[in-house]
Amino acid sequence: MPDYRSKTSTHGRNMAGARALWRATGMKDEDFKKPIIAIANSFTQFVPGHVHLKDLGQLVAREIEKHGGVAKEFNTIAVDDGIAMGHDGMLYSLPSREIIADSVEYMVNAHCADAIVCISNCDKITPGMLMAALRLNIPVVFVSGGPMEAGKTKLANHGLDLVDAMVVAADDSCSDEKVAEYERSACPTCGSCSGMFTANSMNCLTEALGLSLPGNGSTLATHADREQLFLRAGRLVVELCQRYYGEGDESVLPRNVASFKAFENAMTLDIAMGGSTNTILHLLAAAQEAELAFDLRDIDRLSRKVPQLCKVAPNIQKYHMEDVHRAGGIFSILGELARGGLLHTDVPTVHSPSMADAIAQWDITQTRDEKVHTFFKAGPAGIPTQVAFSQSTRWDTLDDDRENGCIRSVEHAYSQEGGLAVLYGNIALDGCVVKTAGVDESIHVFEGTAKIFESQDSAVKGILADEVKAGDIVIIRYEGPKGGPGMQEMLYPTSYLKSKGLGKVCALLTDGRFSGGTSGLSIGHASPEAAAGGAIGLVKDGDKVLIDIPNRSINLLVSDEELAVRRAEQDKKGWKPVQPRARKVSTALKAYALLATSADKGAVRDKAMLDG
């Protein structure tokens, strides 16, 4: 019998009590010779990306047990950022990532599980489970709930998503009837919101990290093909257990799959597909858990050489995740990157000996396997539903046009510089992040006048009250991991700037973060944050700020001497907002803030404080 971790709680006379309890869960004599595989589910009726997951854990469990494992399912929490947005609920979103990671670690270690299947989907759940998997370093397979179908309405000639509903709601020229129509049409099915927002970005990145199956990030939640991903995950995790525990093959462990090279691959993909800036935060956090020295400097280096090969909503209205899938999904983007010499193809995945082998099998422009071609023809049915695997619609053709299609070749890239950039300067000494895919080229270099707000709420009020003018740089500070606390998303301020016609004539800088739905010159993750003594806390109304994306710089046009004077004054006052905010900060949030690092460290806990 292999030397399973679970033997700690299943073997030996002194474990009679534990075995009695295992038996009470349904285990038989023969089960104590099998690997115990945890299924970390995240079903909840609060979140459309998770509302359909209730029965999927047991679907995986049956497949695990059919192939020789013992499956034990548990649940963790899931916060819907869209529902939590615009009020104090957003303070809990990023901290929930740490709770999710902890809860998975607690359950798996407390019960000595041998492996995990992580059933995630939305914004903080995939990152939280990824952090846990890399902490635990036992065999794992990720399988997410899948993306939502894009919405449709006669009032628009393009697919709709959540951001469209938010933008029209903030546009005074839109009638109540139009707003209501968009609201009812934007989110028609279960699944993670239909554009390249944070949830879908992260689920795509698990493919590049090598920890999930091909199609995980792009196969629609409603499509029957997605069921096969769950079944394959159940079979695969048993195989990984056999390889590790039975054969001593450590190459299957998460830290050996998600190596430094794999993190570079994931970030390269993120840049190429114009993913959410939140993915940077989460990859940095995951790298910390894997004990990898992967940081913003590495991301900056990659951002300078990786072109943008895919453009999806919110960066363009024409394409949503269903279109990415039709174009071959993530492995077609990885294939183009590989042909451009931009990908490490020698790294393993949980399903293939190497990324090169996986690309050869799954890239629609390389493979001749008709089953693969059929798989990527899976499309939307256009029928509102909250039921997984409820339709089997297929496109007649694939989108394999690498010159003008959804996915482009390196030679025909949307732009030769990728969709994300890291900026440094005296206002963000440790860096800040911008999603260049959503920035109009006319404002890649922008000098503006600082307009200071010390909370997201006050910024929203100011924008809606027309206090922000063309040429302003809206600065929202004390919204970082420690200062918020919780590093709120700033989707409402950016959406309202857009609805006011200021999207191409203003910028926004914050130590908070942005939704994957953000577009415009929106710069987040300013590090160090204001609450940690960052220079963003020294900016005054009327100061000039120069943003230079091509040169990767952002600077407050104030002398070093003046900044030193301001810093001394701020040290005396304390690094906190001038006016108290009407914000209830619970004990749980205060505990999070106490240990939170700035965004350049992934906003993870400060281990130095824990180690004393």
From Swiss-Prot:
The modification N6-carboxylysine is found at K124. It catalyses: (2R)-2,3-dihydroxy-3-methylbutanoate = 3-methyl-2-oxobutanoate + H2O; (2R,3R)-2,3-dihydroxy-3-methylpentanoate = (S)-3-methyl-2-oxopentanoate + H2O. Transmembrane segments: none annotated. The keyword Metal-binding applies. Mg(2+) binds at D81, D123, K124, E489. Keywords: 2Fe-2S, Amino-acid biosynthesis, Branched-chain amino acid biosynthesis, Iron, Iron-sulfur, Lyase, Magnesium, Metal-binding. Its EC number is 4.2.1.9. Its cofactor is [2Fe-2S] cluster; Mg(2+). Pathway: Amino-acid biosynthesis; L-isoleucine biosynthesis; L-isoleucine from 2-oxobutanoate: step 3/4; Amino-acid biosynthesis; L-valine biosynthesis; L-valine from pyruvate: step 3/4. GO terms for molecular function: 2 iron, 2 sulfur cluster binding; dihydroxy-acid dehydratase activity; magnesium ion binding. Binds 1 [2Fe-2S] cluster per subunit. This cluster acts as a Lewis acid cofactor. [2Fe-2S] cluster binds at C122, C193. GO terms for biological process: isoleucine biosynthetic process; L-valine biosynthetic process. Disulfide bonds: none annotated. The active site is at S515. GO terms for cellular component: cytosol. NCBIfam families: ilvD, PRK12448.1. Homodimer. Belongs to the IlvD/Edd family. Functions in the biosynthesis of branched-chain amino acids. Catalyzes the dehydration of (2R,3R)-2,3-dihydroxy-3-methylpentanoate (2,3-dihydroxy-3-methylvalerate) into 2-oxo-3-methylpentanoate (2-oxo-3-methylvalerate) and of (2R)-2,3-dihydroxy-3-methylbutanoate (2,3-dihydroxyisovalerate) into 2-oxo-3-methylbutanoate (2-oxoisovalerate), the penultimate precursor to L-isoleucine and L-valine, respectively. This is Dihydroxy-acid dehydratase. The gene is ilvD.
